[in-house]
Regions:
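Gly/Ala-rich phosphate-binding loop of Rossmann-like dinucleotide-binding domains
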Residues: 22, 26, 161
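Conserved dinucleotide-binding and phosphotransfer motif residues
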Residues: 28, 113, 164-165
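Helical element adjacent to the flavin cofactor pocket in flavoenzyme catalytic cores
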Residues: 141-188
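Beta1/beta-strand and adjacent pyrophosphate-binding region of the FAD-binding site
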Residues: 3-17, 33
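Dinucleotide-binding Rossmann-like beta1-alpha1 core, especially the glycine-rich loop
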Residues: 50-128
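Glycine-rich FAD pyrophosphate-binding loop
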Residues: 26-46
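A short, glycine/Asx- and small/polar-enriched loop/turn
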Residues: 98, 131-137, 179-186
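Short loop/edge segments at beta-strand edges and connector loops
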Residues: 36, 121-122, 171-173
Length: 188
């Protein structure tokens, strides 16, 4: 393995976050080197269930989630990989009145930002997810644009996309140290 002598950005970690950063920077014309000490996607991404959702309780996370869902919808075109995206919806089951009040406010905020979430009763929750146990459930929230995708496919798609834009992606190469120089660059 021969690493470049110079690069503009070093991304450490080859999971969903690192490969996404590498892809977007490389696509924007930035010289990128991505280092992953093990296999791509072998860290926390390897333990992710792949859930994707827009049901959050604050404006920032709702906005980020909506952008992510849009990106996942177009992933087969950009960066160009199938990620096994299924918009099956996401159901939160609630069994405490105080949680229902919190989720009612969250649903109102989500709706203000274009998220089609809604509060449902236990019978509709059971209809939406027949295997869900609804004993003790007093309400639920559901959003049909939520779902799941393959985290491994997302990682591999972003890594391939980053490479296609000139990034150097090096699995099996961990960062063991760095130091800053007067030019505000790092030496590894």
């Amino acid at each position: 393995m021969t690493l470049p002598a110079r690069t503009e950005v070093v991304v450490v970690g080859g999971g969903v976050m690192g490969t996404s950063i590498a892809f977007h920077l490389a696509e924007a014309g930035v010289e990128v080197l991505l280092l992953e000490r093990d296999a791509l996607g072998s860290g926390s991404t390897s333990r992710a269930a792949g859930g994707v959702r827009a049901q959050f309780s604050d404006e920032l996370n709702i906005a980020i989630a909506l952008r992510s869902l849009e990106a996942f919808d177009r992933f087969h075109d950009r960066p160009g990989c199938e990620i096994d995206l299924h918009k099956t919806g996401y159901l939160f089951l609630l069994d405490r009145e105080e949680d229902v009040r919190v989720f009612e406010r969250s649903v109102a905020l989500q709706n203000e930002h274009g998220v089609p979430s809604r509060l449902v009763d236990p019978a509709e929750a059971k209809r939406l997810s027949p295997l869900a146990g609804v004993d003790g459930v007093i309400a639920a929230t559901f959003c049909p644009i939520d779902g799941h995708a393959s985290p491994e496919s997302v990682v591999l798609g972003y890594a391939a996309g980053a490479r296609s834009h000139g990034a150097v992606v090096e699995p099996g190469c961990g960062l063991t140290g760095s130091r800053s120089t007067a030019e505000r660059s790092a030496r590894c």
